[in-house]
Amino acid sequence: MNKKLFSLAAALVLCTTMTAQKPWDNGKLKVSENQRFLQFENGKPFFWLGETPWLMPERLNRDEVAFYLKRCHDAGFNVAQIQVINGVPAYNIYGVPSHDKQGRLLTSGAYSYWDHLDYIIDTAAQNGIYVGMVCIWGGLVKGGKMNIEQAKTYGTFLANRYKNRPNIIWFMGGDVPGDVKPEVYEALANTIKSIDKNHIMTYHPRGRYTSAKWWSKAKWLDFHTFQSGHRKYNQRMGNKDYPIPDNTEEDNWMYVDSTWAYKPIKPVLDAEPSYEEIPIGLHDNKLGYWKACDVRRYAYWSVFGGSCGHTYGHNAIMQFYREGYGPAYHCKKTWTEALYDPGFNQMKYLKHLMLSFPFFERVADQSVVLDNGKQYERLAATRGNDYLLIYNYTSRDMKIDLRKISGDKKKVWWMNAGTGELTWLGEYDNKVLTFRPHKEGAGIEDGVLIAIDSSKSYLSKDQHQIDTPVGGPAIDLTE
């Protein structure tokens, strides 16, 4: 895409997003009363749907920032996770450093590194998007680029600069274990929290770990994240110390339970699952690449396991690959091409689905599935008091106990996870029934079986898309 088109896109952003209602019009983000979800101050639910533009502060110019964030808005994302700095100093696309040669924050000049970050945050706000601010990437802390006193100085700077922006979510860590110089993160987190009373905070851990392993008692941490990572089943890669059982690498649903084994319970989500179009196993493309169906599977498995939301990622977008940059992780396309890949544009159906039903009563409940399998054959079930959702990755038969929710009769639909299309299956008695999404030989289509107490009107028989709800609770789907 050329510069003129980017400039036009940037202008259109201002025209189309300035007057729209923003999520924070509902108040600040906070943890729900049951400690398992995120919500606004006025009680409305917040379903986290994140994207991973990690290198946006360094690799995108202003017009590209506006174009990218508008595409995120249109695709339903409400959180953009970035590295604030990926070096000391870090340099942006204009060649401007974040720090001077002595390692001091550099805020002078006509358009500083931090002015560009301001622009990113403000443009995200215009699009109704929170910015997940990984304050300093973990490798820098591990490498000794920040000590306790520097963390306090940096935290004071960040908190004072951004405490009044409405769309900030703080991240400690950055792909690093929590026992690597934890005193630096404690200093950084506590400094920010002592100044900024407006925003929630979490920690981004190393792959196959949950932040709860190190930070379950940390007062500064409001919710947990885990990184299920980019490996396939039975891809241990010779690791001697392995935090998960063998041959469970893709079972990201299990991290919800392992996180909640730590007390107190806090909301949790997968902040880095396998990315669309990244090599299976990350470093070697001989096994192929993760595709849209895989990123959908990770999203539904995690959320139906109890997560308060989900983060999606794309190999090309996370590094903003284009001509002139060396491609990391065998990247095959540019970031602008990736914005039109299927997985990027299909995550919104999960968000719309979860916001179509009573939000805070939802629990994971595998007891509704009477013939469950393992790995790809595993059906993931979640329910409220009067609705039941079952994600089926392989379109296999499902023996389901409809008695687990209220109602003498149940209305049932099938939702295509790739399109959000709803198919009315009928009304059924309150008993154990076997459902098959498709006729024999019709092929594979991952999706969700939806069963609702027939006395409820969360969905309509005539509704053909999950993102056009009819009736049901007064739920704002714009966040």
Locations of the language-model features?
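Short beta-strand segments
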Residues: 171-173, 202-205, 225, 269-272, ...
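Short, solvent-exposed loop/turn segments at secondary-structure junctions
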Residues: 53-54, 87, 138, 177, ...
